[in-house]
């Protein structure tokens, strides 16, 4: 069949649109306990709330007759595919997640996964970032993935250490100013 006669939505079940940066070869999908809880809560909400609502809308719209020009039906089916894709994605990511509690390093001056690190360099001055899992990093919030170049450069450094960060513009020298971890929770 010629591709000219297919709908653009024929490939809607591909998970390409939800792909996050791949894990490094042999790498693990590290995630903080709070990040794991957020992803799990999103998955359960999709399964228990969002998907059933859309299924009801699609069922109601399908009962209205002609589906080819039924906006509620067409939009509902599209939304259902999006939800199913996100459910598959979250399920896969949670299955391979390795929960790492950064509070176990509370009081340490060495940079490990989950650390909030303040570093300085000659170009940007001081900057604070938190090293998180791939699925929970958000650069707008100062959270970087543990596989990012800056996190890789800082991991295992101690307060006062100077590390090198290779960049396209040359090597930058970063000095670790402060390392913080969340406090240990009373278990």
Please report, for each region that a protein language model flagged, where it lies by residue.
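Hydrophobic residues in alpha-helical segments
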Residues: 62-65, 94, 154
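Juxtamembrane/interface motifs at transmembrane-helix termini
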Residues: 58-59, 91-96, 148-149, 185
């Amino acid at each position: 069949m010629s591709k000219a006669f297919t709908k653009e939505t024929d490939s809607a079940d591909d998970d390409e649109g939800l792909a996050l940066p791949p894990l490094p070869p042999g790498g693990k999908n590290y995630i903080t306990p709070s990040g794991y809880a957020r992803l799990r809560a999103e998955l359960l909400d999709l399964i228990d709330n969002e998907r059933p609502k859309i299924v009801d809308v699609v069922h109601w719209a399908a009962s209205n007759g002609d589906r080819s020009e039924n906006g509620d039906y067409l939009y509902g089916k599209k939304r259902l595919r999006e939800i199913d894709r996100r459910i598959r994605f979250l399920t896969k990511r949670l299955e391979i997640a390795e929960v790492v509690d950064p509070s176990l390093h509370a009081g340490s001056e060495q940079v490990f996964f989950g650390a909030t690190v303040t570093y300085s360099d000659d170009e940007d001055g001081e900057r604070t970032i938190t090293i998180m899992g791939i699925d929970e990093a958000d650069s707008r919030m100062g959270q970087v993935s543990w596989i990012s170049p800056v996190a890789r450069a800082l991991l295992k450094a101690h307060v006062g250490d100077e590390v090198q960060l290779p960049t396209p513009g040359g090597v930058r020298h970063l000095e670790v100013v402060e390392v913080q971890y969340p406090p240990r929770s009373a278990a």
